[in-house]
Amino acid sequence: MAIHADTHDDLRLFQTGEHACGYWSDRQARDLVLDPHDPRLGAIYPQALAWGFRRSGDLVYRPHCERCRACVPVRIAVAAFHPDRSQRRCLARNQDLVVRVVAAERTDEQLALYRHYLKHRHPGGGMDEHGATEFDQFLIGGWSHGRFLEIREPAIAHLPGRLLAVAVTDVTGHALSAVYTFYTPEAAARSLGTFAILQQIQWAQRERRAHLYLGYWIDGHAKMNYKRRFSALEAYDGRHWRGLPAHASVD
């Protein structure tokens, strides 16, 4: 299969075999994957995001299931975003934290937090055995233009505060893409997942990037409801990006 990319050659796409769906336990899934050996992949990636694709490691994919179209690509038009009351409270609750953007280079501290997060969120699912190799393959890859947004407790005696969260973020000319976020489960009251997205939005606004891509939203899926709580949300229907009304947050 090929698609036209306004380059000298068309892009090759591969269709995976069916595999267990990561969202619905009673369904099978399959994906379309851009040719992982295409040397243009890094240059093509910004356009692929606009086509509804997403990155995992070095793979750029989008769901292509035979009997299901539940996964909807979504992004935030950051210039039009306004936090709701719950999101403003989240920002206020975490105003003591230190946020910085660093190179996408694994540290022992990040790896320890990642493994702790997976053991808490995905026990027995295979990912909880991830080590340094899997961290690099899944979150960094070989060609992506990624950065890590670190969220820490305040510094003590000139020493960095405890690492609470890392938001793996791809940077393109006109957008940011939220690849994966992991955080300490013990700080649930801080709503660090929401706080990380709010920080990514502010990052995109500061750098005058048009969008923050949030991956896929699934209507009616409890783990995806949080994405509808952000204003200025747009969904891709396969041809066009269209606005979605925000759902109210619940404190």
UniProtKB/Swiss-Prot annotation:
GO terms for biological process: ubiquitin-dependent protein catabolic process via the N-end rule pathway. Keywords: Acyltransferase, Cytoplasm, Transferase. It catalyses: N-terminal L-glutamyl-[protein] + L-leucyl-tRNA(Leu) = N-terminal L-leucyl-L-glutamyl-[protein] + tRNA(Leu) + H(+); N-terminal L-aspartyl-[protein] + L-leucyl-tRNA(Leu) = N-terminal L-leucyl-L-aspartyl-[protein] + tRNA(Leu) + H(+). It is found in: Cytoplasm. It is an enzyme of class 2 (transferase). GO terms for molecular function: arginyl-tRNA--protein transferase activity; leucyl-tRNA--protein transferase activity. GO terms for cellular component: cytoplasm. Coiled coil: none annotated. It holds the Pfam family ATE_C. SUPFAM superfamilies: Acyl-CoA N-acyltransferases (Nat). Its EC number is 2.3.2.29. PANTHER family: ARGININE-TRNA-PROTEIN TRANSFERASE 1, ARGINYL-TRNA--PROTEIN TRANSFERASE 1. Functions in the N-end rule pathway of protein degradation where it conjugates Leu from its aminoacyl-tRNA to the N-termini of proteins containing an N-terminal aspartate or glutamate. This is Aspartate/glutamate leucyltransferase. It comes from Xanthomonas euvesicatoria pv. vesicatoria (strain 85-10). The lineage of its organism: Bacteria, Pseudomonadati, Pseudomonadota, Gammaproteobacteria, Lysobacterales. The gene is bpt.
